[in-house]
């Protein structure tokens, strides 16, 4: 009987050992997400709401950059600004305060055609329905309307065949405008800043999604929770991430958006990170989100 050498015993089985997987920012094993396949035709659109009642969590930044990344992959994308602050419109360089026709007119005036409100952006394949402060009066005007929760869905119907995705940037509330978005969407993406108070609000939001699904839109599903503004250097962020994964599991996107000074720069420039800094880590992260969203919706 030949004794094994010390070097052989250190290998612990050698060839048959599973290699230690590389971990992603979520703490789960990193996986390769395939790029979306090329399309041979476009439409009908899948409508996605970017939704969180807490402000400052990266909804608008994520809407712009997810839309731009999808357009890079050959998708036709329409972004809808549903926030009276008009940050989505401004972030794409559209002078929204000067416009006569916006999403407000679509909601309150059935004679307004959506084709009159769509603006081309500087990104090929990416269009926008803008908003401005006029939208703040929409909920008051709609409150007594029959089918008031379906107004946005009716307005979008004529262009459903023209786009692959329609992404709605919701305002930071769970009022009638947000309910309109959820009522016409197939999916919801919930961006959340990686900090404790953002985590606390997720239960209320998921409860609202459940109520809309039960009462207005049986097809509504949560596509995923997108962690944004993650600072891997801080213990707090890592602890919150661990808790989010513990509570929501596979609902959390593998793709994580880290904190960077690049995003304020793109807001001033009026263009997405994918064109402003195409080789940056942030641009690659949003391409990952786009690939993962397409993958999840195809299941």
Residue ranges and their predicted role:
Residues 1-299:
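P-loop NTP-binding core
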């Amino acid at each position: 009987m030949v004794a094994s050498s010390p070097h052989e015993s250190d290998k612990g089985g050698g060839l048959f050992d599973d290699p230690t997987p590389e971990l992603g920012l979520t703490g789960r094993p990193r996986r390769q997400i395939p790029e979306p396949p090329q399309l041979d035709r476009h439409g009908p659109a899948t409508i996605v709401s970017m939704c969180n009642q807490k402000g400052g969590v990266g909804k608008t930044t994520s809407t712009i950059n997810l839309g731009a990344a999808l357009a890079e992959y050959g998708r036709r994308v329409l972004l809808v600004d549903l926030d009276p602050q008009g940050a989505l419109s401004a972030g794409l360089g559209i002078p929204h305060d000067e416009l006569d026709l916006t999403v407000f007119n679509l909601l309150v005036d059935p004679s307004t055609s959506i084709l009159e409100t769509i603006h081309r952006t500087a990104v090929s394949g990416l269009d926008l329905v803008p908003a401005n402060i006029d939208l703040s009066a929409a909920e008051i005007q709609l409150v007594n309307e029959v089918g008031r929760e379906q107004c946005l869905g009716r307005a979008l119907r004529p262009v459903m065949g023209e786009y692959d995705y329609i992404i709605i940037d919701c305002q930071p509330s769970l009022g009638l405008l947000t309910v309109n978005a959820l009522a016409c969407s197939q999916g919801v993406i919930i961006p959340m800043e990686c900090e404790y108070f953002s985590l606390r609000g997720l239960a209320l939001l998921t409860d609202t999604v459940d109520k809309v699904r039960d009462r207005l839109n049986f097809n509504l599903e949560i596509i995923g929770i997108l962690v944004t503004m993650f600072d891997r250097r801080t213990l707090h962020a890592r602890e919150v991430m661990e808790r989010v994964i513990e509570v929501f599991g596979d609902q959390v996107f593998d793709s994580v958006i880290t904190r960077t000074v690049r995003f304020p720069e793109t807001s001033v420039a009026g263009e997405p990170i994918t064109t402003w800094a195409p080789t940056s880590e942030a641009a690659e992260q949003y391409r990952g989100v786009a690939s993962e969203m397409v993958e999840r919706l195809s299941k």
